């Protein structure tokens, strides 16, 4: 019975992740809180973790703490970039960064970059946050995770580290 439950749990996690993966990561150049531009091309050759957030989202706040641990664990092996979407403004982001002791770049997006990552369109404008994208050194999205019940371990537990370890070892799903 535990075996069947385990298979079902794995199947649910796989079905809830990766639907936006396997394609070239859309390029961008976005400003951070201090006005410095961050271009995705500058991170070519290393694993990049992008999370799309809103500072008022409780799951995004929880993820910020997890990403701080990811940055501490992996150092230069993994670049962590957060992208905030409207209605976040400079004051909200400054408060968020200070409140979570964030050292990695938090970038401002007017919505176009996040829409290209999430494949949002006028016909399908739904954007769920947080959403994490894992990008390999060649610029391909290898996996992505939107926050759902069956992906909570990615956002709250060690699941994200396992996915990063898999990608660093060259064993990504796509």
Task: List the predicted regions and their residue ranges.
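Conserved redox-active cysteine motifs that mediate thiol-disulfide chemistry
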Residues: 44, 52-69
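Structural microenvironment flanking redox-active thiols in thiol-disulfide oxidoreductases
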Residues: 61-101, 112-117
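Hydrophobic beta-strand anchors of alpha/beta hydrolase catalytic cores
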Residues: 49-50, 80, 132
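Thiol-/selenol-based redox modules, centered on thioredoxin-like
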Residues: 129-174
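Sec-dependent N-terminal signal peptides
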Residues: 3-12
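Short, internal strand/loop/helix patches
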Residues: 96-131, 135-137
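N-terminal "domain-start" segment that seeds a small globular fold
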Residues: 15-40
């Amino acid at each position: 019975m535990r075996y069947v439950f385990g298979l079902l749990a794995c199947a649910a996690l796989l079905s809830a992740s990766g639907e936006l993966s396997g394609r070239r990561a859309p390029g961008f150049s976005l400003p951070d809180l201090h006005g410095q531009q961050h271009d995705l091309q500058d991170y070519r050759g290393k694993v990049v973790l992008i999370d799309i957030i809103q500072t008022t989202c409780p799951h995004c706040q929880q993820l910020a703490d997890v990403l701080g641990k990811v940055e501490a664990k992996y150092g230069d092996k993994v670049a962590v970039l957060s992208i905030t979407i409207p209605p976040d403004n400079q004051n909200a982001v400054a408060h968020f960064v200070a409140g979570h002791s964030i050292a990695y770049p938090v970038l401002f997006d007017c919505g176009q970059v996040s829409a290209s990552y999430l494949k949002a369109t006028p016909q399908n404008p739904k954007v769920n946050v947080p959403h994490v994208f894992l990008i390999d050194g060649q610029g391909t999205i290898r996996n992505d995770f939107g926050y759902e019940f069956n992906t909570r371990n990615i956002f709250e537990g060690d699941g994200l580290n396992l996915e990063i370890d898999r990608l660093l070892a060259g064993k990504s799903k796509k």
